Amino acid sequence: MEEKEVVPTLKRPRKNLNLEAVVLVNGHGGNVPIKDYLIDIENELGLKIIFNNSIVEIEGPHAGTGELSMGMVLGIADESRLNEHCHFEKYPEVGMVGLQEARQQNKGIDDGACQVENEGVSVDLELGKTLLEKATRNIVKDVQSLLE
């Protein structure tokens, strides 16, 4: 999501609900750069914004074991397709394994890709539950900080 998309997305609820603050819960690593624009967005809207990146920070490699395990706990992943998931030629975005330019430009992406290449991807329901609980606790803390 880009800055130009965030402002209109928040403008109507800000006005209609008379919001003073929001917690934006990010679930996609590609949205992290929006943090660079939060002060401008806050000033434009007169709205306090907390950017919660817990899910992205704790899930591990993109489409890897952590993300897939959380998806299974939430009921949005299909375990029967797990074998197909690790065909990196067909799905280069899994773990970012096949995205060479991204791997060359970002050590964190390359580290995650190496992890997926070496360990593969699996479903671990306990891990998924633990990650979701941790993310939820962090989100609740952010909401509580707005209420203080």
Pin down the residues of each PLM region.
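Extended, histidine- and acidic-residue-enriched regions that form the cofactor-binding/catalytic faces
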Residues: M1-A21, G27-E148
